[in-house]
Amino acid sequence: GLYFDLAARTEEQKRRVREHVAALTDHLIDHGFRLVDHDGKVTRWGTFDPASLNHDPEWWEERSLNSISILSYLKVAEHITGEPRFAEAARKLIAEHSYAMNTLIAKTPFGPGSGNQSDDEMAFMCLYNLTKYETDPKLLAMYQQSLRQRWDVELPELCPLFNYVGANGLKQSAGDWLGESLDTLERFPLDRFNWALKNSHRKDLVVLPGFASDSGDRVRGHRRNGQVLPIDERYVNQWNHDPWRLDVGGDGRHLADGAAFLLPYYMGRYEGFIKD
């Protein structure tokens, strides 16, 4: 959606975006809200149909996230193409299969550090679209509530990307998250090599119990204020990493890119959270 709105400058560029987005979204609709690969099989996480999400116990954990995802895809396709079939598909999922209600069923955490950042990143990206493009006040309020629930869980992780998405979707302009986001960006290491880091020996940290998540033998914890370590005291590749992990192995042979900084930085500037 943002590429179409901000980056595609010419009508030819916009036409190509429309065709590409329409083809992908039509594929999902034509295959019963499933992403089917060239071998005829549904991809690992490409299940968005009501029978699976609402009635198959194998998929109940994905009910909320995948409902958010498919509604986001349909809303972006509607926004970009203006085609009523995408709005009608979303209306059917919402009216007949309670997909908007599904978005409110956020994961129940077992305490600090028990989330899944990959799922959270997907949810935040999709909720950014839904809160940006939805015009129905009732649906917008539901999407904002879903975002609020997820943002509350993410706040201790000091992630500027999640904070800016949350604040933008909820129309907030001030809070502790604002200074914490700027602090994270200011501290963000210029050295993007994966050097080994060890913090588990520190006496100023609280070690999380093993039941918080299935992390194997990884030692996980936080500062005594309940927040994760500052960004320059841990390694970050992308924002779907585990920020609660205290020890990170590495030998300096992997170079991460700069997207983890650039995406929240420019989002913060565009949405007005970062001032000159």
What residues fall within each predicted segment?
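Positions within ordered alpha-helical repeat solenoids
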Residues: 6, 30, 34, 76-79, ...
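Long, internal scaffold/assembly segments composed of regular secondary structure
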Residues: 56-68, 74, 82-155
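Terminal, non-catalytic domain-edge segments
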Residues: 123-276
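Short, hydrophobic/aromatic alpha-helical segments in well-folded domains
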Residues: 3, 24, 73-76, 126
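Short coil/turn connectors between adjacent alpha-helices in alpha-solenoid helical repeat scaffolds
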Residues: 11-12, 81-83
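Charge-rich, low-complexity amphipathic helices
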Residues: 43-51, 99, 112, 149, ...
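Extended ligand-binding groove/face enriched in aromatic
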Residues: 1-61
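Long, well-ordered core segments of solenoidal/helical folds
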Residues: 19-39, 85-107, 142-162, 223-243
